[in-house]
């Protein structure tokens, strides 16, 4: 079988506060790279301090992609991310540079590296109608309906799982095809690059927790709450009926800050809630990352030499690329 001749890229994955940004910058400077953000908070304008967005100096030193794509009252889907990321990667490769995918949003990584199924978008009216029917006949009755229109999905979905029953019926009603049809379609196109997956994660949970606390305190000292107040004051945000439903506001830290500024609890209670929410996010991220069986794990502090050897072994000597691109 012929060797994979696709250009190389690296994916720097890991829980929040694990050091991905610093490593991405180091790798970009050493191997002539450009950074593609894989972070669902960094796509929103105005989310700076609380999202740990790369500052102007970092962006001047290394080109960054997929930052500040939407306003905080707008929505940005994983499918949109995958399309934008593919375009950015192709442009980086065309310049003879190394794409460095850095972030911790698992859904974005899956959409890009594995592809998404072609499921229709959610439909609020259809969901409301199904919920009203459930109130009348129960979810078991709706499961029976699902068994008639999509026996394959009904066999996988338990009669006591209302969320999945609702979604399966919603897809059928708005598309005319069962959800099992959509899920059987090929998920997406092959990436034009060969990717080394690197996971940065401290071996000891206490170390990661300490990093999370220190980072939040630094954000507060830099004016995080004032930043959230500025976002809240935007006319478009004030016009939103339920701001806490917006993806930008649901970002970890921002939701807790929003609730605090709404008058929920003391500053100390906000800090505790934000730290706890960030720890829970890190736990979810680690659970997802353990499923990435082809990824290589490194402790960001203990495994520096092993990490460097892994990167050098994969990337080799890219000095010729630097010379060709004039960098």
Curated annotation (Swiss-Prot):
It is an enzyme of class 2 (transferase). The keyword Nucleotide-binding applies. It catalyses: adenosine(37) in tRNA + dimethylallyl diphosphate = N(6)-dimethylallyladenosine(37) in tRNA + diphosphate. Pfam families: IPPT. Its cofactor is Mg(2+). ATP binds at residues 14-21. Keywords: ATP-binding, Magnesium, Nucleotide-binding, Transferase, tRNA processing. Substrate binds at residues 16-21. The record marks 105, 127 as: Interaction with substrate tRNA. GO terms for molecular function: ATP binding; tRNA dimethylallyltransferase activity. GO terms for biological process: tRNA modification. Its EC number is 2.5.1.75. Residues 39-42, 163-167 are annotated as: Interaction with substrate tRNA. Monomer. Belongs to the IPP transferase family. This is tRNA dimethylallyltransferase. The lineage of its organism: Bacteria, Pseudomonadati, Pseudomonadota, Gammaproteobacteria, Lysobacterales.
């Amino acid at each position: 079988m012929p060797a994979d001749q696709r250009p190389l890229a690296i994916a720097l994955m890991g829980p929040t506060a694990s050091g991905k940004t610093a490593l991405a910058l180091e790798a970009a400077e050493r191997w002539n790279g450009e950074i593609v953000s894989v972070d669902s908070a960094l796509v929103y304008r105005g989310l700076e301090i609380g999202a740990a967005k790369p500052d102007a100096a970092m962006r001047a030193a290394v080109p960054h992609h997929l930052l500040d794509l939407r306003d905080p009252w707008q929505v940005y889907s994983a499918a949109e991310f995958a399309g934008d990321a593919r375009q950015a990667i192709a442009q980086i490769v065309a310049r003879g540079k190394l794409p460095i995918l850095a972030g911790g949003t698992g859904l974005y990584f899956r959409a890009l590296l594995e592809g998404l199924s072609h499921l229709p978008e959610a439909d609020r009216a259809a969901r409301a109608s199904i919920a009203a029917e459930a109130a009348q006949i129960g979810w078991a009755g709706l499961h029976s309906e699902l068994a008639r229109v999509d026996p394959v999905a009904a066999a996988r979905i338990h009669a006591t799982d209302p969320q999945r029953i609702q979604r399966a019926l919603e897809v059928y009603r708005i598309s005319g095809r069962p959800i099992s049809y959509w899920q059987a379609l090929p998920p997406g196109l092959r990436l034009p690059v060969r990717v080394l997956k690197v996971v940065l994660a401290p071996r000891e949970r206490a170390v990661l927790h300490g990093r999370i606390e220190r980072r939040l305190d630094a954000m507060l000292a830099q004016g995080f709450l004032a930043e959230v107040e500025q976002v809240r004051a935007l006319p478009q945000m004030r016009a939103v009926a339920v701001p806490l439903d917006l993806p930008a506001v649901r970002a970890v830290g921002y939701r807790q800050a929003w609730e605090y500024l709404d008058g929920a609890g003391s500053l100390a209670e906000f800090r505790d809630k934000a730290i706890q929410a960030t720890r829970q996010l890190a736990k979810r991220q680690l659970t997802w990352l353990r499923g990435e069986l082809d990824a290589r794990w490194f402790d960001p502090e203990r495994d520096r030499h092993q990490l460097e050897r892994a990167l050098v072994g994969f990337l080799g000597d890219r000095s010729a690329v630097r010379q060709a691109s004039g960098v």
